[in-house]
Regions:
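Conserved inter-motif catalytic segment of the P-loop NTP-binding fold
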Residues: 32, 45-46, 183-267, 271, ...
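Conserved catalytic network of the ASCE P-loop NTPase/AAA+ motor domain
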Residues: 180-183, 246-248, 280-283, 315
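The Walker A/P-loop phosphate-binding site
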Residues: 110-207, 214
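C-terminal regions of RecA-like/P-loop NTPase motor modules
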Residues: 1-39, 247-248, 330-460
């Protein structure tokens, strides 16, 4: 032991520093190695403090004969000389075979190397501007872009989690269904802040059974490849574990259920939201995050961007934003109707509302169906449709007067007359004058003579 101490203490700080190697594992995660000394240090969970300090978690391991294993782990501002000096002193107390001055030189070199790389950020790259095939790169068309975040928000019990689990199963199977296109099987990590594995396991099993993928042709159970992670800390504290799972399993899609629970701060605080987006961008995977509306959004049951709970930077940071609106008029206990409303789109055209119907038997989910605008127009889901689609839904079964169409839309005849006239000019509707001079509007196929004994209709 004494010989080892003598040999080590003969090594100058300069020699140890020259032996130093810094490795960037990923954004904000580094590893420093001193081969001669047998010391390895990890630096991660880096944050910018309000006072401009950079704070990080430092973990030092030793492979030396004395004190082998973990030496010390702490979180300090790595821009503070006092903190670095104190950390080096603590390391010397753990392994005195390395002089205090040598420990200080090692920690200084580690922190300086990390700070330089952290501050310079990503290198600039030249934009050629010569791309001929300009298109949106979808992971899940038309919902989630490649390596970009999508938020689906809706009130509690609207069916957000069930929809996310349905999408996750489609990804796992590489299955296109109900207008959701997935070209090949994808690896999914479901990060759950809201429930537990038992409930999520049951829900995934229900969805897989409804889609016919729970069993093979011989009736044998077929397991999914979906990864589940129970999270009970803010995203900043869960990020390292999530990243390890992403790397280990080659994850393509990260599902966050839900944003409010994952934030670990005030959703109205722009600094909290911006830090959240920065953390998610480090994962470099596509993200489907579930969120909730604000109080006004819950009262109105609408899905515009102003209904999303929290800071406007939440909307600014997302690429695709969808509101999930649940019908409040559905009387049948075995059905839930919901509509996805495209509220924000950066690089794509706005999608038409996508309606879904969850059909349940007495104990479980039985089917997931797509519903068209005409069906949505028959319930309170019509509020998410354009005036064009609401009018078409109102006259889908029979021609109606302007007042009758307006009543269907909870408007007055005066409010929609210009839209009716526009649709007649475009050929989407026909104007029909009855024998008693009432003006009615219908679909083109309705501009025909009625049954014998009825009014004679004249198409204008």
């Amino acid at each position: 032991m004494e010989q080892h101490e003598t040999e080590t203490n003969d090594i100058s700080p300069q020699i140890l520093v020259q032996d130093f190697e810094i490795i960037k594992i990923r954004d904000s995660t580094y590893e420093g190695i001193w081969k001669t000394a047998g010391i390895r240090a990890e630096v991660n969970r880096m944050t910018n403090e309000r006072n401009k300090d950079i704070r990080a978690e430092l973990t030092v391991h030793s492979s030396r004969p004395i004190g082998s294993g973990l030496l010390l782990q702490t979180r300090i501002p790595i821009t503070s000389s006092t903190s670095k000096k104190s950390f080096a002193t603590d390391l010397h107390s753990m392994d005195g075979t390395i002089e205090s001055s040598v420990w200080r030189a090692m920690i200084e070199q580690l922190c300086a190397s990390v700070i330089v790389d952290y501050r310079k950020g990503s290198p600039s790259e030249r934009i050629s501007g010569t791309t001929m095939d300009i298109k949106t790169h979808w992971l899940i068309e038309p919902l989630v872009e490649l390596q970009s975040p999508t938020i689906i928000f809706g009130e509690g019990s609207a069916g957000k989690s069930l929809l996310a689990q349905y999408i996750s199963v489609l990804c796992d199977e590489g299955m296109t269904h109900n207008g959701i296109t997935i070209k090949e099987p994808l690896k999914v990590l479901y990060a759950d802040w809201e429930t537990n594995k038992l409930e999520v396991e049951n829900r995934f099993s229900m969805v897989r059974k409804a889609l016919g993928v729970l069993e093979d042709s011989d009736g044998n159970l077929v397991e999914s490849n979906i990864q589940y992670k129970k999270c009970d800390k803010p995203i900043d504290d869960e990020a390292e574990g999530i990243q390890l799972d992403i790397d280990k399993h080659g994850i393509d899609l990260l599902v966050i259920d839900s944003v409010g629970m994952a934030l670990g701060g005030d959703a109205n605080d722009s600094s909290v939201i911006n830090a959240f987006w920065r953390k998610l961008s480090q994962f470099k995977v596509s993200i489907l995050a579930l969120d909730h509306p604000n109080k006004a959004g819950m009262m109105s049951n609408r899905a515009d961007p102003t209904s999303l709970n929290g800071s406007q930077y939440k909307v600014a940071g997302v690429r695709q934003l969808f509101g999930l609106v649940k019908s409040r008029e559905m009387a049948a206990e075995n059905k839930i109707q919901v509509t996805l409303v495209h509220s924000k789109h950066n690089n794509t055209a706005r999608q038409q509302p996508m309606g879904f119907e969850y059909v349940f038997n007495s104990i479980a989910l039985e089917d997931i169906k797509r519903i068209n605008p005409d069906e949505m127009g028959k319930s309170d889901l019509r509020v998410v449709l354009s005036q064009f689609d609401q009018i078409k839904a109102a006259v889908a079964t029979s021609a109606k007067t302007a007042e009758e169409v307006a009543a269907h839309m909870d408007k007055t005849g005066l409010q929609i007359r210009s839209r009716l006239s526009e649709m007649v000019r475009r050929g989407d509707l026909v104007k029909i004058v009855t024998e008693d001079k009432n003006t009615m509007y219908g679909l083109p196929k309705q501009g025909t003579l009625p049954e014998s004994g009825g009014d004679e209709w004249t198409e204008i």
